[in-house]
Amino acid sequence: MEEAHLLPAADVLRRFSVTAEGGLSPAQVTRARERYGPNELPTEEGKSLWELVLEQFEDLLVRILLLAALVSFVLACFEEGEETTTAFVEPLVIVLILVANAVVGVWQERNAENAIEALKEYEPEMGKVIRSDRKGVQRIRARDIVPGDIVEVAVGDKVPADLRLIEIKSTTLRVDQSILTGESVSVTKHTDAIPDPRAVNQDKKNMLFSGTNIASGKAVGVAVATGLHTELGKIRNQMASVEPERTPLQQKLDEFGRQLSRAISVICMAVWVINIGHFADPAHGGSWLRGAVYYFKIAVALAVAAIPEGLPAVITTCLALGTRRMARKNAIVRSLPSVETLGCTSVICSDKTGTLTTNQMSVCRMFVVAEAEAGTCRLHEFTISGTTYAPEGEVRQGEQPVRCGKFDGLVELATICALCNDSALDYNEAKGVYEKVGEATETALTCLVEKMNVFDTDLQALSRVERAGACNAVIKQLMRKEFTLEFSRDRKSMSVYCTPTRPGLVAQGSKMFVKGAPESVIERCSSVRVGSRTVPLNTTSREQILAKVRDWGSGSDTLRCLALATRDAPPRKEAMQLDDCSKFVQYETDLTFVGCVGMLDPPRPEVASCIARCRQAGIRVVMITGDNKGTAVAICRRLGILEDTEDVVGKAYTGREFDDLSPEQQRHACRTARCFARVEPAHKSRIVENLQSFNEVTAMTGDGVNDAPALKKAEIGIAMGSGTAVAKSAAEMVLSDDNFASIVAAVEEGRAIYSNMKQFIRYLISSNVGEVVCIFLTAILGLPEALIPVQLLWVNLVTDGLPATALGFNPPDLDIMEKRPRNPREALISGWLFFRYLAIGVYVGLATVAAATWWFLYDAEGPQVTFYQLRNFLKCSEDNPLFTGTDCEVFESRFPTTMALSVLVTTEMCNALNSVSENQSLLRMPPWLNPWLLAAVAMSMALHFLILLVPPLPLIFQVTPLSGRQWVVVLQISLPVILLDEALKYLSRKHVDEEKGRQ
C-alpha cells in the first residue's frame, strides 16, 4: 500500500477491513499470505563451485594459455629420446599456473560477503500482533506477518514490516531509521496523515519501516507492506538488478588479450607457411609430416613467447601491495581491480555526516543575558573549541579564555545541560576515543558541561574513563532528577523536575529545567536571568534574543539552537498529572530564560585542504545528504565545495527539485551540481547513472542499507567502517576511519599504482616482443632454435616477474595530484610509447639471436661454421659436402641457447633498471630510488645462475655453464640497451615538452 502515509489511520484500517482492537481473522490471514507471500526477503541463489571454477577461465589471456598448454601436451606425446621428459615440463608449468590462478579466484569469490544476504540481518525473527483468534497481544514469527496485521512495537524492538502508525501508547515515539534514511539522530513519529504524495521516507513521520529500531516509546501500527514490498525489499530488488561492470583495467587487459590472440595467430601462421619449403629437409628424415610438426612446434614456442604468462600474477601482486599501503591509510580495499580504478576517479560523491563532518555533535557557541533593562538587551556571547566528543576545549569570550564559574548565568546553563539530559560520554579504551551513549544532541550538552567545568573541579589526576563524566557528576550531586516530561511535537520541548540534595539548597525548593526549540521555549518565558537576578522579559529583549537565534541558524553557520530555561517555582509533583501528556505544556510555563546554545556536526579539520587537493587534481566533489538544503549548502561553503559568494542555482538541489527536472535537465544537473540535499536511495543511483553517461568515473560513499544499490552501481563504492554490513559488502572499499581524507589518499595511491603498472606492463611486453623477434628471426633465417619453450616460460614467469613486481614500488611522481584524471579508455600502449617499447623489444630479439650466432661463428670453443652453413644446418649430413668436417650434433649444443638465454635475461635486467621512470634519465632518477628493484634484479640473476649450475636444472632447461670470455660477450651485447632507452627517453622528453608547449 504505497499511499498509506497520505490517509488517516481509520481509512487505512478500512482498506484492510480490520479494527485496531480485533485484528485480522484467520481467514483474512490465509488470504493475505496467499496473495503477498511470506514476510521475508528471498535467499539469493549462490553460484555453484563448478560455475565459479569456469568463471576463472573466461579471461581471454587464460584461454590462450590453456590452448598453448593443450597443444604442447599433444606435441610432447610424440617426442622421442631425452627430450621426452623435458617436453612435458612446459604444459605442466602452464597448467599449474592456471590452476593456482583459479584456486585464488574461487577462494576470493567464496569468501566475499554477499550484500543481498547481509540484508537479512535486519529482519527480526519475532513480532507482536493482535489477531481475532486470540485475546490480547500474541508473539508470532515475523515471516508470518501479513499486510493488515495489527502490530505492536516497543523500545528495543526491530520493526517487522512497514507499518502505518495508528496509536502511540507513550509520550513520544522515537525511531532510529539511520540504516534506511541516513539520518544521524532518532526521529520522532506521530499518527497524523501527511497529505504529500511526493514525501520522501524522511518526511513520512507516520510510518515505521521494516528493519529500523524503536529508540524509545511504544506504539501500535497496521502492516501495509511485507517482504519484497517493504522499503528494505525495494533496496534488495535494486541491488539484485545491478550488473557488476568490469573495471577499466579488466577491460584493457581483455582488449590486450584480443589483440594478442590476433597477433599470435598471424605470426604463428606466417612462421609455419614461410618454412613449408623446409618440411622435407634431411633433418626430418625426408618426412614432410615430421617437418610440418617440427615447424608447428616452433609456432607453439612463438605463442608461448608472445604470451606474458607472468602478467596476471604481477598485476595481482602489485594491486595486493597497493591494498596494503591503502590499509595503512585507513582505506581497506575489498576488490583488487578497484585499486587501479581509483586512479581514474573524476567525481567523488560523498555523504556529509561522518565523512565530511565528524558525526560528533558539538556546541560551538552559547550566550547568556548580560543586561535586560527597558529598551536595551546585551548578551554575553562565548565560543567553544573542540570538534569531537572529547571533553577537551576552551570557552572564550572574544579572543580571551574565560573561567565559566565567574558567570552565574553559565553556572545555571551548565546545570540545565547536565540535568535535562539522558545521555552520557563514555571512553572506549579499545579504540582510544570518547563516544556518545544516547542522543547526539544531548551528548553535545554533556561534553559542553565538561569543557565549562563551572565548579573548577580538579581534573588533573583523573583517568580518561573518570574524566568522561566528572563535571556532570558534581552537578548531579547537588540536584536529584525526580522525573522527566518527555519531548512532544506540540510543545517542542522536554523538561526535568529536580529537587536539591544538599541541606543548604533545600530552601531554594524544587525546580523544573527546560530545553527545546528557541521560539517555543521563549514564547513561554515571562522573565530572563541576568547574572543571579531575575528580570521581566520585555519585547525588546525577546526580539533581540530571537534575532540572535535566527542569525546563528542561518547564513554560513546554520547552527542547531536550543533554548535553556528554568521554572523556579513549579507545582508540587504530587499535584502534577504525569499520565496526561497534554498537561505538560501547562507545567512548562512562566519560565525564566537562562541562555541558548548553538551546535553543529562540525566539518573534519583536514577535509577542506583535501577538497582543495581534489580540485587541483581535476576531481569534482559532490555532497549528497539527507539533511535539509540550508545546512548542506552551509557545510559546502565551509569546506570549499562551494565558494562563499557562489550562487547555488544549478549547483545545489533537493531530491524534490531534482525530480521536477526533465531527464535531460537531470543529466545536466549531475554534470554541474556540487550538492544534493534531502535525497533518497533512488536519487543516488540515478545520480551515478547520469554521471556514468558522461563517462565520469564515480566514487560513491555510503553507510546505510539505503546506500547499497548506489554503492554497487558506482565504479568505486566506498562504505564507512562504522556503517552497516550491507553497505560494506556492496562496496569495493571500506574506510576504517570514516574520513574523507582517506578517500583522497586512496585516489593518490590509485594513481601511483596505475603509473607503476604501466611501467611493468610495458617492461614485460617489451620482453615478450624480444622473444617473439628472436624466434621469428631464427625461423625466417633458418637458424637453430635460440630459445626453447621451457626457457621462455622461466623468463616470463620468474626472471622477468621479480623485477616487474618490484616496479610496483617505484616512488610516485611529485606532481601526481596535479594532473587531471586520466581517461579510463586510455590505451596502455599507443603511439610513441608503442614505438619505444617495440624498439627495445626488437633490440632484445636481435641481441638474443646475435649471442647464439656468435657462439656458432666466432667463439673459440664453438664450431666456427660459416653463416651459410648455419642457415642450412637442417641439411647437415655426412653425405653433404657443404658440411665436410663438421659434426652435425654441434647444432644441438646447449651453449648457443645458454648464450641467448643469458643475453635475454641480462638485457631485461638492464631494461628493468631503466623503468624506474617513464621519461626521466637514469641520471635524474637512479635505480637506487627503488631498493626493491635492485634486490629483485640481484635475485633474478641469482636464479639464472642457479639453473646454469645446479643439477638437474641444466638438464630441464637445456643449458650449460658459460666461461668468463662468454660472459664478457653477453655483457657487451646486453648493456647497449641502456643507451638505446636513454636516447628514446630524451626524444620522449622533447616530445612531451613540445606537446605541453602547444597546449
Swiss-Prot record:
Residues 788-808 are annotated as: Interaction with phospholamban 2. The modification Phosphoserine is found at residues 17, 25, 662. Residues 370-400 are annotated as: Interaction with phospholamban 1. It catalyses: Ca(2+)(in) + ATP + H2O = Ca(2+)(out) + ADP + phosphate + H(+). The modification N-acetylmethionine is found at residue 1. It is a multi-pass membrane protein. Residues 1-48, 111-253, 314-757, 809-828, 918-930, 986-999 are cytoplasmic. GO terms for cellular component: membrane; sarcoplasmic reticulum membrane. GO terms for biological process: calcium ion transmembrane transport; intracellular calcium ion homeostasis. Mg(2+) binds at residues 351, 353, 703. The chain crosses the membrane at residues 49-69, 90-110, 254-273, 296-313, 758-777, 788-808, 829-851, 898-917, 931-949, 965-985. Ca(2+) 1 binds at residues 304-305, 307, 309, 796, 800. Pfam families: Cation_ATPase (PF13246), Cation_ATPase_C (PF00689), Cation_ATPase_N (PF00690), E1-E2_ATPase (PF00122), Hydrolase (PF00702). ATP binds at residues 353, 442, 489, 515, 560, 625-627, 678, 684, 706. Residues 70-89, 274-295, 778-787, 852-897, 950-964 are extracellular. Disulfide bonds join 876-888. NCBIfam families: ATPase-IIA1_Ca, ATPase_P-type. This magnesium-dependent enzyme catalyzes the hydrolysis of ATP coupled with the transport of calcium. Transports calcium ions from the cytosol into the sarcoplasmic/endoplasmic reticulum lumen. Contributes to calcium sequestration involved in muscular excitation/contraction. This is Sarcoplasmic/endoplasmic reticulum calcium ATPase 3. The gene is ATP2A3.
